[in-house]
């Protein structure tokens, strides 16, 4: 199984377009300690030829250009991207669908709840139904979006997308609007969970034994954005678990047998983005890799 992390940042990327927090300031200055990062997306293939795109970032054209595996190679119109799978309806995971509208056939997979957030917005009708086949997938159903690649979706604690929030919103609910994925090929297993509000016993059981885990790395501490002075929301309010602390992802997953552990979907205010920081060193010392754009895994 071949895995390419196309975009490793959370919504807005690094640096964010209007941000001069301490981390974005380093990125704007071209400081080598903070790599620029695009918004959350990965691609997975069983053979290096046919690819499944997981989440369609607003930066998808830039990501395709930066990764030769994604380039068109045959005739006048071609793409090695055969299918797209959405793990939620967040803007940073669906806006890139509008870029993939140039008459290129592919299948779009999501749970009924996630797919409804796309289908109910007419702007996405630029993806003609006869060209882009929308496929509804139930939780715990195993399917093959690309031949040789088996995928199972499962609910994880989360919330509805920001643009669908209302008074009835429940943070941490396990529904079909935020899902994790288990991907299998060639006897190897990859768990991809870019958004998660908490680690449950069921989640730990599902990912146990995976050869690699790509997990929500939005915030180091729950109050990262508040400490940075650029926002008032906590990680929890945004539907994301913190890395640190007794209930954080590092401690909660420490006893789960997993191969490689990689943080993705990293917010611009997370200090682990600074490569020589004590925060980065602490995370790495506990067995985790901080993803960057273009990072590849061959399982």
UniProtKB/Swiss-Prot annotation:
Keywords (A to Z) from UniProt: PQQ biosynthesis, Transport
Pathway assigned in UniProt: Cofactor biosynthesis; pyrroloquinoline quinone biosynthesis
Gene3D superfamilies the record matches: Ribonuclease Z/Hydroxyacylglutathione hydrolase-like (3.60.15.10)
Top-rank lineage group of the source organism: Bacteria
Coiled-coil region: none
Described function: May be involved in the transport of PQQ or its precursor to the periplasm.
UniProt similarity note: Belongs to the PqqB family.
The protein's name in its UniProt record: Coenzyme PQQ synthesis protein B
Organism name: Methylorubrum extorquens (strain CM4 / NCIMB 13688)
